């Protein structure tokens, strides 16, 4: 009789779940994790990137965030292709939001980096409040990989809810 071994992604989810059982903490994660991703992406997007001539009018779409996106989607793909596609879709939507904030900045609004710093700090405060309520330290304090696991941990609940095998 053959026993089924768990995939690495499921082992990560099991470990992550250990410090995410309180309902309030979970709700805060559903709010704060996407905001942290958005703000981190926006902060990296804000770092000046050198002009590359052959990109022409598309220079604004290749920046340091492009490398972060490529790395994270590849990492997620190694864990679960389905979850990586879902993350890529979310990142595309977030990128649209970041480009919109860039346009706002160009028309006299607040700087993209400033908006992202505020969102980033507020979201991490929310995360730590959630873990204080939970009574357990955040998973990433044991292993930094869990900073990348949080977003797909949320997505795997959506997959389970609608019956998508990830």
Question: Over which residues does each language-model region extend?
Answer:
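Hydrophobic alpha-helical transmembrane segments
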Residues: 35-42, 95-99, 115-119, 151-161
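Cytoplasmic-side transmembrane-helix entry/capping segments in multi-pass membrane proteins
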Residues: 84-93, 142-144
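Membrane interfacial helix-start motif at the N-side
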Residues: 13-34, 40, 71-83
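Membrane-proximal soluble regions of multi-pass membrane proteins
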Residues: 1-19, 132-166
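Transmembrane alpha-helical segments that form the membrane-embedded catalytic/substrate-channel core
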Residues: 69-81, 96-100, 119-135, 154-158
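Structural signature of hydrophobic alpha-helical transmembrane segments
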Residues: 51-66, 113-118
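Juxtamembrane "helix exit" motif at the C-terminal ends of alpha-helical transmembrane segments
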Residues: 37-56, 92-103
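Short hydrophobic alpha-helical membrane-embedded segments
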Residues: 30-33, 59-68, 86-91
């Amino acid at each position: 009789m053959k026993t089924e071994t768990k995939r690495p992604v499921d082992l990560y989810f099991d470990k992550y779940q250990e410090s995410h059982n309180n309902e309030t903490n979970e709700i805060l994660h559903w709010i704060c994790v996407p905001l942290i991703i958005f703000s981190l992406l926006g902060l990296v997007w804000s770092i000046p990137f050198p002009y590359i001539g052959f990109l022409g009018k598309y220079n604004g779409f290749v920046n340091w965030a492009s490398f972060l996106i490529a790395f994270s989607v590849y990492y997620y793909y190694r864990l679960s292709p389905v979850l990586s596609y879902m993350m890529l879709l979310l990142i595309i939507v977030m990128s649209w939001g970041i480009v919109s904030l860039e346009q706002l900045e160009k028309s006299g609004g607040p700087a993209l980096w400033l908006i992202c710093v505020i969102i980033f700090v507020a979201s991490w405060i929310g995360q730590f409040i959630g873990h204080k309520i939970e009574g357990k330290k955040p998973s990433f304090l044991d292993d930094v990989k869990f900073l990348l696991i949080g977003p797909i941990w949320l997505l795997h609940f959506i997959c389970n809810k609608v019956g998508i095998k990830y």
